[in-house]
Amino acid sequence: MNNQIDFVLPVLYDKFLSEMGEDGEFNLEDSGITLYSKADLVERNTTYQIEEWEPDYLMIGQDGDLAFFIKKDSDDTIYMNDLGALGSIQMEIAASDVYEFIK
């Protein structure tokens, strides 16, 4: 993965990132879920080799071994999958968009 996001982010997710700011993380209260800032997205996806195992998705956060994704050049749906099962089992839908996800 190069040093920048080279596809169009979903509208609501892009808005969420803008509201969060360039740095930092969003921690979902009492859940263990962390959503990454725009500055961390490329590094996290490179570290976990997401491009190799799930090339159509971008990891946007995680809760331990459970990761959360958006589909590249797609709608605002948030998906989830176990990091140890990437590429071998289908993504599950977690929410219709990031704002529903953080409720």
Name each model feature, range by range.
Residues 1-69, 74:
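A surface-exposed partner-binding patch
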Residues 79-98:
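A short, surface-exposed interaction/processing loop segment used at functional sites
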